[in-house]
Design a protein with these regions (language model features):
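Exposed aromatic-hydrophobic patches
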Residues: 542-548, 627-631
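Extracellular, repeat-based ectodomains that mediate carbohydrate processing or recognition
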Residues: 31-495
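Short flexible loop/turn segments that cap and initiate beta-strands
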Residues: 521-527, 607-612
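N-terminal secretory signal peptides that target proteins for export/translocation
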Residues: 1-9
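Extracellular/lumenal mature domains of secreted and surface-exposed proteins
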Residues: 491-492, 500-514, 555-558, 564-661
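Sec/Tat signal peptide C-region and signal peptidase I cleavage site
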Residues: 25-31
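Short beta-strand segments within Ig-like beta-sandwich modules, predominantly Fibronectin type-III
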Residues: 533-540, 619-625
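Bacterial N-terminal signal peptides
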Residues: 14-25
């Protein structure tokens, strides 16, 4: 007997629909240095710039001074969702002139501002107080000013430095110059000065007191280059550094850890010798960075006069291991950050700017004879020094006073960072050079300037936890200045996509994702299936994929997040297993043509064996297995009917005509 098979199947056809021919490259877009925008000005009423700050979530703001009815007051422009908002006045209840404003930022749009203002007179001289005000998360106006320090004397060269954590705590360090005192004057021109610190716990300010180690000796006359600096971690711990002379008259750099509302002991942070020979020149321009675990990195400038063991002025760095290390009780020892500086004793070295990422890698930027020098390092030590980017360019005022331009640099937590310094465009017009370093080692640079142009004044940089940075500065001559800002924009941060695990029916394919962190919202999301874009509702964080777009098999799902500037991040592919077809049935001749073999399988969700039912057409039935053998007793025409079901419930029926001769 020879069996011939007429295959007639009553199973649903799976139709594959043509998708849009849209190719996507699964890569993270680079950050963009956006054009500068003028926040306010040019105006004769703008009389000072106080800095910029950016929180980990990408919100932030800048602060500056503007005269109202002839009196200088504090103004802030907030940065929210990738846009600068109209400036608002901070000191609305104060009638006296403000000075020395500084700003800090925390998540949710929270801002803290401090400034100095007169409140009384003594011996016909003004007595200033240091005030602070807070704009709460989601707020639109600053609260009433509170006293940080009720008496900072005349507020001359207070030079506050404010650091704020993502959790809303802040520290401020500032100087108070006394006219009278019993301190020993070590050098002509020295002053009687206190370096003070205050802590903000999120609700109120607490004065921690004076950090100087020797109140009985004089300090160098206050300048921007010898101003104290402070850094803070998310838990409220931090560090303060300052310049203070020793009894022999040489000014060194000192440091103290901060533990919330308490001060730790004083630690020397600068070198007293080099190559076994003493260093007898002043150290100045301290810069400090601090990590979550409590590691601190201090950089400073060391002068070198005649007889110095140094070949010329140099930048030194010193490491304070984190609080979890046994060696975290003292600095490791100051070392020269960059020995390749030309010019000998006459080299022009600018103040350093240093920062750390969460991997405890450092980046230091400074001006070496007009060239931007970048020093990098890891927990194993300094790893390289190089020059890249437009040159430093002095303003006319800096040239007249033989001042070297300052740089400012911040690192992103995962590596890379943003740096800025005064420079000039190809035509010689003043501009700010911006450098973006990426974690993979790539670099981009650019020049930014306000629309009205003019000389570059004070300059500041802030950074988020998302790879973004803010650059802000005062531009223009006194009496016609502007406040200018620019953003170094990063694509949306990587985010989590949730795809159901295991085999699914097409109707069960629901894709969910968490919102991507970005400073440039609102974001739009697009689901990408096997490289093809699917229509995704605006504002959605989930999508039920149309079953018609899903054939049986393994698919790749990604989600594309795009910010307001068109920068996008595409997630890594996630596997989506779809089973929309019943098990496969095979019927073949067997037993020399006198019988058939029926086999059933399912390579996707698996076969429900107990649901398998076979009718051989001659009255014989079987089930509950994956393979069946049957011999027909006599010639004839028979219809084999096989009913199957998989573990998802996909059912199928196969009918085949079998002829036996």
């Amino acid at each position: 007997m020879i069996a011939t098979i007429d295959r007639r199947r009553t199973r649903t056809l799976v139709v594959t629909f043509a998708a849009l021919a849209f190719a996507l490259h699964a890569q993270l877009a680079r950050a963009v240095i956006l054009p500068a925008v003028t926040i306010e000005g040019p105006s004769e009423e703008i009389v000072g710039f106080g800095g910029v700050a950016m929180a980990e979530d990408g919100t932030g703001g800048l602060v500056y001074l503007k005269r109202v009815d002839g009196v200088a007051h504090v103004f802030v422009s907030r940065y929210v969702a990738g846009h600068w908002l109209a400036p608002i006045r901070v000191d609305t209840e104060e009638s006296f002139a403000a000075g020395s404003p500084r700003i800090g930022a925390a998540d949710g749009g929270e801002l803290v501002v401090v400034w100095a203002t007169p409140f009384a007179t003594e011996d016909e001289k003004p007595v200033d107080e240091l005030l602070g005000a807070t704009l709460g998360p989601g707020g639109s106006a600053f609260g009433k000013a509170t006293i940080v320090d009720p008496d900072i004397r005349e507020g001359i060269e207070t030079s506050p430095d404010l650091a704020m954590s993502s959790t809303g705590q802040a520290d401020v360090v500032y100087r108070v110059v006394e006219e009278q005192g019993r301190a020993t004057l070590l050098r002509s021109g020295d002053v009687i000065e206190q370096v003070r610190v205050a802590h903000f716990d999120g609700e109120r300010w607490t004065r921690l007191g004076v950090v100087n180690r020797e109140l009985g000796i004089s300090m160098r006359p206050p300048t921007e280059d010898n101003a104290p600096q402070i850094a803070i971690g998310p838990t409220g711990t931090g560090i303060v550094v300052w310049q203070e002379p020793e009894l022999d008259g040489v000014a060194r750099i000192w440091a103290r850890r901060l533990f919330g509302q308490s001060l730790d002991y004083v630690m020397p942070a600068s070198a007293t010798s080099f190559g076994a020979a003493p260093i007898n020149e002043d150290a100045d321009a301290p810069s400090v960075a601090f990590t979550r675990l409590g590691q601190a990195e201090v950089a400073y400038r060391q002068d070198a006069g005649p007889g110095s063991p140094l070949p010329g002025p140099r930048i030194f760095v010193n490491d304070l291991p984190n609080g979890e290390a046994a060696s975290g009780t003292e600095f490791a020892g100051a070392i020269v950050a960059d020995s390749s500086v030309a010019g000998g004793k006459g080299a022009l070295i600018g103040p350093p700017s240093i920062d750390l990422d969460e991997k405890e890698s450092l980046r230091l930027l400074y001006d070496a004879n007009g060239t931007p020098r970048v020093v990098e390092g890891t927990d194993l030590g300094l790893s390289g020094t190089f020059s890249l980017g437009p040159p430093f360019v002095q303003s006319k005022e800096q040239q007249e006073h033989s001042e070297v331009p300052s740089a400012t640099s911040v690192m992103n937590p995962e590596g890379g960072g943003v740096s800025a310094w005064p420079s000039a465009d190809p035509s010689g017009a003043p501009a700010v050079a911006v450098r973006e370093d990426f974690p993979d080692g790539a670099v981009q640079t650019g020049l930014i300037s306000g629309a009205a142009g003019g000389p570059i004044g004070e300059l500041a940089v802030g950074r988020s936890n998302l790879g973004d940075g803010l650059v802000a500065f005062q531009q223009g001559p006194t009496g016609d200045a502007s406040i200018v800002a620019a953003q170094v924009s990063a694509p949306p941060d990587t985010f989590v996509v949730s795809v159901p695990k295991g085999w699914l029916k097409p109707s069960q394919a629901l894709i969910k994702w968490l919102p991507a962190a970005s400073a440039n919202g609102p974001l739009t999301y697009t689901v990408v299936l096997d490289g093809h874009v699917l229509a995704t509702p605006a504002g959605a964080t989930s999508l039920a994929i149309d079953p018609r777009d899903l054939g049986t098999g393994v698919h790749e799902v990604q989600v594309l997040a795009t910010d307001a500037y068109g920068q996008s991040t595409l997630t890594s592919p996630s596997k989506l297993e779809i089973d929309g077809a019943p098990p496969v049935v095979k019927i073949a001749r067997a037993m020399g043509g006198d019988g058939v073999t029926v086999s059933v399988s399912d390579a996707q969700s698996g076969l429900d064996v107990q649901a398998v039912k076979v009718s051989f057409g001659d009255g014989t039935r079987a089930g509950g297995r994956t393979v069946f053998h049957h011999r027909y007793a006599r010639a004839g025409s028979y219809t084999v009917v096989v009913n199957v079901r998989d573990n998802l419930g996909n059912r199928g029926t196969v009918r085949e005509r079998v002829s036996v001769r």
